[in-house]
């Protein structure tokens, strides 16, 4: 997938456009009376479209507005089954989608620390290895990005990336970008392929456990990525119902 230098540019890029995100990001985040923050359920998008509230990896453009040639590089589209809409990735190439939260100051993960979402994995990239720079493919992953500090006058975030792994056991943790990205395996292998599964992660606890300190109260973005470009596999995965919940 992306080599180290590109990964570094990725994280620098997110912070290079945070002002733009704060000024322009418009999304359908809803705050329920039950304390739940409803981030995204894909229900209000047209079937077959790239959701227009999701940005490119660096957060400075919206793929849904691209010319067709460039828009087709993004293998994500809204799909409907019965009454349910969701986001599907189907392809090989790696493209992130970025759901900005930097302007959602009402979000406080100390009040709603549980990130909950559904995904459905159909294929895993054979030989995918998220701990390798040359085979770094995963069927599905969710990044939670936090604004924390500056390095040499450049803002560099820290990120937790939750993955469905081709090979590693659940609970495996890997470190990238000099420890500023932590990869946590939460699903693995071919078990339950083709079935919707719900995952919940306590962001505050995970952050404290893997970074050893307290997180900022509001993430700056959630990103998703499915890719199989290093292994040249063809994969399919679905995403839906991103929410933040109070602690159980």
Show the residue positions of the predicted features:
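Bacterial N-terminal signal peptides
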Residues: 7-16
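Extracellular carbohydrate-recognition regions
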Residues: 23-65
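Extracellular beta-strand elements of beta-rich domains used
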Residues: 42, 222, 240-244
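Short carbohydrate-recognition loop motifs
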Residues: 72-97
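Extracellular/lumenal carbohydrate-interaction signature centered on repeated Trp-anchored short motifs
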Residues: 102-115, 190-193
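Solvent-exposed strand-to-loop "edge" motifs in beta-rich extracellular domains
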Residues: 118-124, 147-149, 204, 227
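Short edge-strand/loop segments of extracellular domains
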Residues: 132-152
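Extracellular beta-strand ligand-recognition surfaces/modules
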Residues: 137-143, 179-180, 186-189, 193-234
């Amino acid at each position: 997938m992306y080599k180290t230098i590109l990964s570094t540019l990725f994280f620098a890029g997110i912070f290079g456009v945070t002002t733009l995100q704060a000024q322009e990001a418009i999304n359908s985040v809803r705050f329920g009376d039950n304390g739940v923050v409803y981030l995204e359920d894909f229900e209000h998008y047209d079937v077959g479209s790239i959701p227009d509230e999701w940005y490119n990896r660096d957060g400075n453009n919206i793929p849904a507005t691209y010319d067709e040639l460039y828009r087709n590089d993004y293998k994500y589209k809204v799909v409907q089954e019965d009454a349910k809409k969701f986001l599907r990735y189907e392809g090989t190439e790696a493209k992130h989608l970025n759901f900005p939260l930097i302007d959602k100051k009402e979000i406080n993960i100390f009040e709603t620390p549980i990130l909950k979402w559904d995904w459905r994995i159909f294929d895993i990239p054979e030989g995918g290895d998220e701990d390798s720079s040359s085979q770094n493919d995963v069927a599905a992953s969710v990044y939670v990005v936090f604004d924390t500090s500056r390095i040499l006058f450049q803002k560099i975030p820290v990120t937790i990336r939750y993955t469905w792994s081709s090979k590693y056991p659940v609970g495996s943790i890997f470190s990238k970008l000099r420890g500023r990205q932590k990869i946590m395996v939460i699903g693995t292998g071919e078990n339950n392929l083709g079935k919707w599964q719900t995952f919940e992660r306590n962001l505050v606890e995970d952050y404290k456990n893997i970074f050893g300190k307290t997180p900022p109260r509001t993430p700056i973005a959630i990103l998703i990525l499915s890719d199989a470009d290093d292994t040249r596999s063809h994969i399919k995965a679905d995403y839906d119902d991103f929410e933040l919940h109070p602690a159980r």
